[in-house]
């Protein structure tokens, strides 16, 4: 499992001109799932993200988690994170999980994030989405389970 995490001042996701998920402050997650991922990977990443200290304390040191800051999460499925661009000019997506399996694991992952005590908004799995955010910092990290 691969997640691109962005500390966000605000974020939203729109499908067909309608906002389907929106947060005022917290983390925007682009979530990629490969065919080798399991529920164990999803739980590991959910716990890691909820407790990752990437928000500044009063002295400017990254010392607080999204939980500490009472932030929210906007989670967006993104199979293109497993695009392989090493050969040719078109990405190969063979490492991305098949949609049925990926959707199950994506839903499970979001529930695991909720179990950590976070409010989670989502995009629409498999849809073409427009994602808008103000990246705070900017702070952008890649979190992987393997």
Swiss-Prot record:
HAMAP family found in the cross-reference section: Deacylase_Dtd
EC number: 3.1.1.96
Top-rank taxon: Bacteria
Cell compartment(s), UniProt: Cytoplasm
Family: Belongs to the DTD family.
Gene3D superfamilies: D-tyrosyl-tRNA(Tyr) deacylase
Disulfide bridge partners, by residue number: none
Primary role: An aminoacyl-tRNA editing enzyme that deacylates mischarged D-aminoacyl-tRNAs. Also deacylates mischarged glycyl-tRNA(Ala), protecting cells against glycine mischarging by AlaRS. Acts via tRNA-based rather than protein-based catalysis; rejects L-amino acids rather than detecting D-amino acids in the active site. By recycling D-aminoacyl-tRNA to D-amino acids and free tRNA molecules, this enzyme counteracts the toxicity associated with the formation of D-aminoacyl-tRNA entities in vivo and helps enforce protein L-homochirality.
Motif interval(s): Gly-cisPro motif, important for rejection of L-amino acids: 137-138
Name of this chain's protein: D-aminoacyl-tRNA deacylase
Single Gene Ontology BP annotation: D-amino acid catabolic process
Record text about domains: A Gly-cisPro motif from one monomer fits into the active site of the other monomer to allow specific chiral rejection of L-amino acids.
One GO CC term on file: cytoplasm
GO molecular function: D-tyrosyl-tRNA(Tyr) deacylase activity; Gly-tRNA(Ala) deacylase activity; Ser(Gly)-tRNA(Ala) hydrolase activity; tRNA binding
Keywords: Cytoplasm, Hydrolase, RNA-binding, tRNA-binding
Reactions listed under catalytic activity: glycyl-tRNA(Ala) + H2O = tRNA(Ala) + glycine + H(+); a D-aminoacyl-tRNA + H2O = a tRNA + a D-alpha-amino acid + H(+)
């Amino acid at each position: 499992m691969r997640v691109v995490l962005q500390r966000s001042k605000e974020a939203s996701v729109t499908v067909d001109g309608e906002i389907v998920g929106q947060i005022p402050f917290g983390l925007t997650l682009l979530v990629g799932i490969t065919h080798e991922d399991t529920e164990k990977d999803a739980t590991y990443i959910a716990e890691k993200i909820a407790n990752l200290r990437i928000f500044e304390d009063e002295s400017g040191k990254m010392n607080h988690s999204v939980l500490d800051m009472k932030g929210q999460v906007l989670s967006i499925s993104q199979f293109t994170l497993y695009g392989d661009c090493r050969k040719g000019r078109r990405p190969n997506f063979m490492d991305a999980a098949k949609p049925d399996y990926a959707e199950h694991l994506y839903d499970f992952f979001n529930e695991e994030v909720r179990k950590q005590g976070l409010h989670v908004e989502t995009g629409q799995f498999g849809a073409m989405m427009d994602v808008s955010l103000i990246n705070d910092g900017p702070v952008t990290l890649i979190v992987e389970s393997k």
